[in-house]
Swiss-Prot record:
Residues 223-230 are annotated as: PABPN1-binding. One of its GO terms (biological process) is symbiont-mediated suppression of host PKR/eIFalpha signaling. A motif (Nuclear localization signal) lies at residues 34-38. The gene is NS. This is Non-structural protein 1.
Length: 230
């Protein structure tokens, strides 16, 4: 087994333990707690795959971190923090487009993980573009603020938004939700394209026809769920 794989797992286990102690003292906010739960599941899976005991790995991770901290100067820590890139906020929509109220003649709604998908199934034979406002870090989508579907006339006919009760989502969550929304709109013979900005940072690529490169799994989910649920 690669020793770097083992040491990475050990450090991750110890850092999770530290974050758990922070949560136990009621110092973590909702996104912090959400990531804590997600990472716990991930560590259990990694431990099972690697055949490593989490408690033993946590102790070993503590020793690694303590050794690094002894060697770390305050100046080096400041330089490390300064070199971490900050999130960027990208906007496809204007403030008016984001805040505008809209209604649906035939409303449909689906919850996909931590995201809520809404669309008007009365819309047919329209050209539709999906626009989104979101944050980016390391040139990848970090957090979706809001996504809306617009007709050429500017009418809002669909939306994807984070659920306040389930904070925290991944780029994969967003891509899956976009796939469901596209499938629902295309079911009524609409032509849907995704903004170049969203394609670039969510899928790391773009197509001239505005369609993101959905995986076979996403295409199956679109076809299987949209008929009955959206």
């Amino acid at each position: 087994m690669d020793p770097n794989t083992v040491s990475s797992f050990q450090v991750d286990c110890f850092l999770w333990h530290v974050r758990k102690r922070v949560a136990d003292q009621e110092l973590g906010d909702a996104p912090f707690l959400d990531r804590l739960r997600r990472d716990q599941k991930s560590l259990r899976g990694r431990g099972s795959t690697l055949g490593l005991d989490i408690e033993t790995a946590t102790r070993a991770g503590k020793q690694i971190v303590e050794r690094i901290l002894k060697e770390e100067s305050d100046e080096a820590l400041k330089m490390t923090m300064a070199s971490v890139p900050a999130s960027r906020y990208l906007t496809d929509m204007t403030l008016e487009e984001m805040s505008r109220d809209w209604s649906m003649l035939i409303p449909k709604q689906k919850v996909a993980g931590p995201l809520c998908i809404r669309m008007d199934q009365a819309i047919m034979d329209k050209n539709i573009i999906l626009k989104a406002n979101f944050s980016v870090i390391f040139d990848r989508l970090e957090t979706l603020i809001l996504l809306r579907a617009f007709t050429e006339e500017g009418a809002i006919v669909g939306e994807i938004s984070p659920l306040p009760s389930l904070p925290g989502h991944t780029a994969e969550d967003v891509k899956n939700a976009v796939g469901v929304l596209i499938g629902g709109l295309e079911w009524n013979d609409n032509t849907v394209r995704v903004s170049e900005t969203l394609q670039r940072f969510a899928w790391r690529s773009s197509n001239e026809n505005g369609r993101p490169p959905l995986t076979p799994k996403q295409k199956r989910e679109m076809a299987g769920t949209i008929r009955s649920e959206v």
